Amino acid sequence: MKEIGFQFTIEAPDIDESFSPHMDVHLVPTFLAKNKARVFANKINSEVVIASDTVVILNNKILNKPIDRLDAISMLTELSGKTHLVITAVCLYSKTKMEVFDDRTEVTFKNLTRKEIEFFIDTCKPLDKAGAYGAQDCLTPGVNPCSHEEIDFLNSINKSDLIEKSLRGSQAGLGITIIQEINGSYFTVMGLPIHKVYSHLMNF
């Protein structure tokens, strides 16, 4: 957010992230983003809260963060050779109003061997990530993963180098290319669709 011109502080609210088993999985991130934002109802004055939640969905099932290495292997084996959906929902919240939106991106994995999966897990340590992967660690070196919409947005604010900055400290380029294609927003898969957040904030 700082890179696109907004000053902010980060707080991680302690909320119950459970939801009804009957809830449409595509609505879960919106439900959780709203709950995260409401935690700050009595803590803000003129500030705007930006709360978000990201889910990875395969075959109408949400893949959470793996509980251990074996669980991560199981998740990546399940994702191998398939296309899954990543949804990031964002809630903008102030004393006077609330606005919620989401962005949806399809991610296709290459066919992966057990050896490749284990190498990825041991190198990238993805146990803290939904679906057991972080997009920034899985990209083909030299390939811009952003959508045309994102590229146009970054160029319009003179931040075309933001892609490279997002990859610093990642494992991209170490031969761990497990993503075949991203159809939609790269930053949505990263956890925040910055082009949409910017647009909504400017009109909030």
Each model region followed by its residue ranges:
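Anionic-ligand binding patches
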Residues: 24-204
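N-terminal G-site helix/loop of the GST-like fold
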Residues: 1-11, 195, 204
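Short secondary-structure capping/turn micro-motifs that flank functional sites
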Residues: 16-18, 137
